[in-house]
């Protein structure tokens, strides 16, 4: 995948870059693996805003992705590499030997016609999935389970990966994209390789409207609000807010540690991110 720079025919296109989609082989999804997607606009089941600055955006069809990789011992052929509007990574359509079709995250380097497999007997090559107990130390992984059978939860965005750095008893030690080293049960499954579409981080949206197409709304600064709306709001003319940065609910932000010290998974973190 390469990044294509647009000609500066307008201010919005001057710094805009787009993917060339060279790895994508089909534009329409597999109908049996799609379902309708209702926009939530950042609201929960009570209709209250739980995620600010969300709303609008282009209509989408949800692609059902196999994060569990629980079809064991059956070889599959990569039929197509497709674009998915619901995530930054590309997805691969698999045709299994028994006739079933499934979508998976497309790893870096996978192409149309390749064979992939899941299970303890699978080869160590991109796209194959197996428990981490069977994976050699030093291997690059993605779509990593946190609990056995729950499905991959770590390293699913474009270009991300974790590295298996050691094994200790029933645990595998992973170096996460953030630099954190943490223990995960070695019985958990992971997929070999790095997530594809690695140049996604180099895309420049170029204009505000392109953010709106993605369903992202403007972010208003606290100091620009009224005092009823934010602790930093109000004042005559332009003001600095008069206190350390806080959220609209008064919780310190911009560097303030908010992680629960008593969180159960803290004991599984060997090295915090940012530590030497």
UniProtKB/Swiss-Prot annotation:
PANTHER family per the UniProt record, alphabetical: LARGE RIBOSOMAL SUBUNIT PROTEIN UL2M, RIBOSOMAL PROTEIN L2
Oligomer status and interactors: Part of the 50S ribosomal subunit. Forms a bridge to the 30S subunit in the 70S ribosome.
UniProt cross-references to InterPro entries, sorted A to Z: NA-bd_OB-fold, Rib_uL2_dom2, Ribosomal_uL2, Ribosomal_uL2_bac/org-type, Ribosomal_uL2_C, Ribosomal_uL2_CS, Ribosomal_uL2_dom3, Ribosomal_uL2_RNA-bd_dom
Compositional bias per record (Basic residues), positions renumbered to this chain: 259-276
GO cellular component term, pick one: large ribosomal subunit
Lineage: Bacteria, Pseudomonadati, Thermodesulfobacteriota, Desulfovibrionia, Desulfovibrionales
Sequence ranges of Basic and acidic residues compositional bias: 23-33
HAMAP family: Ribosomal_uL2_B
PROSITE patterns: RIBOSOMAL_L2
GO MF, any single term: transferase activity
Protein name as it appears in the record: Large ribosomal subunit protein uL2
């Amino acid at each position: 995948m390469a990044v294509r720079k647009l000609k500066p025919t307008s201010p919005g296109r001057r710094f805009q870059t787009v993917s060339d989609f060279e790895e994508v082989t089909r534009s329409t999804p597999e109908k049996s693996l799609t379902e309708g997607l209702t926009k939530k606009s950042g609201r929960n089941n009570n209709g209250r805003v739980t995620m600010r600055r969300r709303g609008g955006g282009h209509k989408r069809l949800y692609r059902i992705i196999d994060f569990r990789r629980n079809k064991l011992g059956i070889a599959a052929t990569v039929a197509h590499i497709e674009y998915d509007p619901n995530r930054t990574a590309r997805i691969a359509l698999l045709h299994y030997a028994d006739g079933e079709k499934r979508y998976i995250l497309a790893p870096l380097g996978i192409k149309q016609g390749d064979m992939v497999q899941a299970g303890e007997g699978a080869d160590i090559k991109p796209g194959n999935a197996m428990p981490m107990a069977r994976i050699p130390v030093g291997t690059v992984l993605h779509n990593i389970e946190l609990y056995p059978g729950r499905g991959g939860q770590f390293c699913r965005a474009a270009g991300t990966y974790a590295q298996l750095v050691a094994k200790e008893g029933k645990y595998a030690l992973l170096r996460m994209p953030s630099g954190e080293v943490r223990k995960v049960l070695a019985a958990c499954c992971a997929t070999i390789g790095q997530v594809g579409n690695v140049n996604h981080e180099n895309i420049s949206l170029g204009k505000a409207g392109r953010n709106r197409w993605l369903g992202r709304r403007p972010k208003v600064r606290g100091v620009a609000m009224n005092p009823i709306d934010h602790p930093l709001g109000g004042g005559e003319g332009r003001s600095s807010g008069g206190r350390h940065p806080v959220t609209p609910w008064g919780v310190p932000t911009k560097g303030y540690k908010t992680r629960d010290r008593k969180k159960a998974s803290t004991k599984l973190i060997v090295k915090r991110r940012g530590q030497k």
